[in-house]
């Protein structure tokens, strides 16, 4: 009976948490902690406009300016302070991006940032004379007989002018094929043999006979003038 009484007293003294063997404080610690959720403020268009105007005036407003602005836009001063912190961080990021883009643009090694060079080959080629050693000595469009100092062949060796094809071409093409300037040293009318070989022989024999007659006449005159 004594044992039964002791067991009954012990059962009354026990608690529900002790039956499990773990204290209630440890059981609460084992439960996962809930993360603190931040309340995001949704700004109206009017509030954003006033905040941006204040940021343009000063990036670091003091407490009095923030309180005055908070009363104006109907927001807590803490929310206004957080907005200015976020706005300054955004402004710094923009400044860094602009500085990096300017450095890339000013780098001389990057050729793709340079403006393309315009080639003015046409006006330069028209204004500057060409090197005479690089040009051909005689242009194919210039006729040979128009070159100064050229001695033309006799007309007997040249084909008649009626046989040239450029005389039968249209006037527009014929003007383009004419020489650029008249030749200053063209030979005159070529020698044409008007007398055949027989006439030349007769003339030479007649000249010789005339010379003989002249000598005989001089000799007769000398004889007549000799003293008697």
UniProtKB/Swiss-Prot annotation:
Keyword annotations of the record: Developmental protein, DNA-binding, Homeobox, Nucleus, Transcription, Transcription regulation
Start-end of Basic and acidic residues biased regions: 1-18
Cellular component, GO, one term: nucleus
Subcellular location: Nucleus
Gene3D superfamilies, alphabetized: Homeodomain-like (1.10.10.60)
Ranges for region Disordered: 1-41
GO MF annotation terms: DNA-binding transcription factor activity, RNA polymerase II-specific; RNA polymerase II cis-regulatory region sequence-specific DNA binding
Subcellular location, principal: nucleus
Disulfide bridges in this chain: none
Keyword Transcription regulation tagged: yes
UniProt DNA-binding residue ranges: 36-95
Domain of life assignment: Eukaryota
Statement: the UniProt record of this protein carries the keyword NAD: no
InterPro entries (alphabetical): HD, Homeobox_CS, Homeodomain-like_sf, OAR_dom, RAX/RAX2
Motif (OAR): 205-218
Motif Nuclear localization signal per UniProt: ranges: 211-215
GO BP terms in the entry: positive regulation of transcription by RNA polymerase II; regulation of transcription by RNA polymerase II
Function, as annotated: Plays a critical role in eye formation by regulating the initial specification of retinal cells and/or their subsequent proliferation.
Family of the protein in this entry: Belongs to the paired homeobox family. Bicoid subfamily.
Protein name: Retinal homeobox protein Rx1
Species, as recorded: Gallus gallus
